[in-house]
């Protein structure tokens, strides 16, 4: 039975690995996307006796899925409301139910509501200022951005982008759409002093070539685990035939 459980756990682990790789490849063109990586651990070891020696492994299981938060390459767009963070930081935006979530995607646009213009993400989330308020744009504003994240129109500052980071970014939880939310593990907001560049976006940090190489490796491992199950099934069939 041991080979059955080892093969079964191996297939599940490699499927989880391939799912993560597929997500990375499909999002390689997504602005600000951060590559996801899987880590695995051995399951419990067993011993055939109490004598000292190496135990017999029982398989592998998913240990964690973490993000590579290294910066992607800057892409020059020349678009006024495209912003790129150069360094460690996240834009704060308003998610569903008014909850604050965080993103590296600075592809912003204007939302016209009740006679006012608001700065929003491409998904429609309100971009927040340093006070946690929605950013309203002046009528007919020609927006300029300072390195410190201050938004100006006609030479006057009307808002400043809220830019934050975290003690443990790996502790952030994915909130969908390239956004993240705080957890106890990530810790609370810490003001970021990263530079923000206007007319520029951050590309994903996915290395597609490396991801395809990992996919091939995972597929081979998946196949080997499948052969383990086939071998176990054949041995079980032969054992049953001997009993009859």
State where each predicted segment sits:
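Amphipathic alpha-helical polymerization modules
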Residues: 1-244
């Amino acid at each position: 039975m041991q080979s059955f459980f080892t093969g079964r756990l191996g297939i599940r682990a490699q499927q989880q690995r391939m799912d993560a790789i597929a997500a990375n490849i499909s999002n390689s063109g997504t602005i600000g996307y951060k590559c996801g990586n899987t880590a695995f651990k051995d399951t419990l070891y067993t011993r055939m006796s109490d004598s000292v020696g190496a135990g017999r492994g029982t398989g592998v299981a998913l240990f964690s899925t973490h993000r590579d938060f290294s910066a992607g390459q800057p892409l020059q767009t020349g678009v006024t409301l495209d912003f790129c963070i150069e360094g460690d930081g996240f834009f704060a935006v308003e998610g569903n139910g008014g909850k604050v979530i965080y993103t590296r995607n600075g592809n912003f646009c204007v939302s016209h509501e009740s006679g006012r213009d608001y700065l929003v993400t491409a998904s429609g989330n309100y971009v927040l200022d340093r006070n946690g308020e929605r950013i309203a744009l002046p009528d007919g504003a020609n927006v300029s951005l300072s390195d410190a994240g201050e938004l100006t129109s006609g030479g006057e500052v009307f808002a400043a982008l809220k830019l934050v980071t975290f003690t443990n970014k790996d502790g952030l939880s994915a909130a969908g759409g390239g956004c993240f939310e705080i957890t106890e593990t990530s810790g609370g907001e810490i003001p970021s002093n990263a530079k923000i560049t206007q007319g520029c976006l951050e590309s994903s940090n996915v290395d597609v070539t490396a991801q395809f190489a990992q996919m091939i490796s995972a597929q081979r491992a998946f196949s080997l685990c499948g052969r383990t199950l086939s071998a176990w099934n054949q041995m079980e069939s032969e054992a049953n035939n001997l009993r009859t």
